Amino acid sequence: MPELPEVETVRRGLQPAMEGFRIDRAVAHRENLRFPLQKDFAARLTGQTVTGLGRRAKYLLADLSSGDVLLMHLGMSGSFRVIGADGETTPGEFHYPRSEDRTHDHVVFEMASGARVVFNDPRRFGFMKVFPRSEIETEPHLKGLGPEPLGNAFDASLLAKACAGKQTSLKAALLDQRVVAGLGNIYVCEALFRAHLSPKRKASTLANRKEEPTDHAVRLTEAIREVLGEAIKAGGSSLRDHRQTSGELGYFQHAFKVYDREGKPCPTCGGTVQRFVQNGRSTFWCPKCQK
């Protein structure tokens, strides 16, 4: 599933074709993706101008001139193609080639920019929903999300308070979208390595008794920002189905220090990168470097 950097890369790729332009026609080729599409889905989009294209955690949010918001989630295999006069691009191109089967082109936006924006999703774990912007604070998919890790509000103090008293593992806490939004398995493994912190460490060790940040929290906050920033610059790194809107692959996977490197030497100490299953997910780490 795409994580924050991949979704941000897709957002940036879609902006030139969508932001500031009217949706001349919206077409849904099926009644449902992961969830049923609203019966008035296409009607609420057709004729509306996309006044802004943002992101919250792993969700894309298109502000519409009607006062509605179009929420989009890529799911496991969803991708967008932008078809214009200059050819076809795929924002947020990911590792594996996208599906060439056009029967999985489920939603199409015909833009006043002259572009056609096509959502293709073979597995149909992605979804879309239109709702009034006035309900954004209560929208179930967005309600309760933690701070954006690249936002100004996210710092060591905030992370420490969120983890204070938590007896869960540090990795489990970071994957909790209520603690910090948008992080997934790849970037949690990489950030913990850069911060020299064990994924098995208790989350509570990020705070002292006064719920003030420890040095661990400071290092981890810096590592999270660093790894996400580098991944966005590289165009993302999700491993299976996801790709950039430009049709090019994301290259941050070539900079992985531990993720998917089981049995290979640690780039810091020369020890062996190990893998173990933690809460049903593979965790990659260096036991010598991460304490």
From Swiss-Prot:
Pfam families cross-referenced by the UniProt entry: Fapy_DNA_glyco (PF01149), H2TH (PF06831), zf-FPG_IleRS (PF06827)
Enzyme Commission numbers on file: 3.2.2.23, 4.2.99.18
Zinc-finger ranges (FPG-type): 257-291
CDD domains linked to this entry: EcFpg-like_N
Active-site residues (renumbered): 2 (schiff-base intermediate with dna), 3 (proton donor), 58 (proton donor), 281 (proton donor)
Residues at which DNA binds: 104, 123, 166
A GO MF term: 8-oxo-7,8-dihydroguanine DNA N-glycosylase activity
Keywords, ordered alphabetically: DNA damage, DNA repair, DNA-binding, Glycosidase, Hydrolase, Lyase, Metal-binding, Multifunctional enzyme, Zinc, Zinc-finger
Gene Ontology BP terms: base-excision repair
Catalytic activity entry: Hydrolysis of DNA containing ring-opened 7-methylguanine residues, releasing 2,6-diamino-4-hydroxy-5-(N-methyl)formamidopyrimidine; 2'-deoxyribonucleotide-(2'-deoxyribose 5'-phosphate)-2'-deoxyribonucleotide-DNA = a 3'-end 2'-deoxyribonucleotide-(2,3-dehydro-2,3-deoxyribose 5'-phosphate)-DNA + a 5'-end 5'-phospho-2'-deoxyribonucleoside-DNA + H(+)
Organism superkingdom: Bacteria
Cofactor binding remark: Binds 1 zinc ion per subunit.
Cofactor(s) this protein requires: Zn(2+)
Family the entry assigns: Belongs to the FPG family.
Subunit structure, interactors included: Monomer.
Function in brief: Involved in base excision repair of DNA damaged by oxidation or by mutagenic agents. Acts as a DNA glycosylase that recognizes and removes damaged bases. Has a preference for oxidized purines, such as 7,8-dihydro-8-oxoguanine (8-oxoG). Has AP (apurinic/apyrimidinic) lyase activity and introduces nicks in the DNA strand. Cleaves the DNA backbone by beta-delta elimination to generate a single-strand break at the site of the removed base with both 3'- and 5'-phosphates.
Protein name: Formamidopyrimidine-DNA glycosylase
Species assigned in the record: Rhodopseudomonas palustris (strain TIE-1)
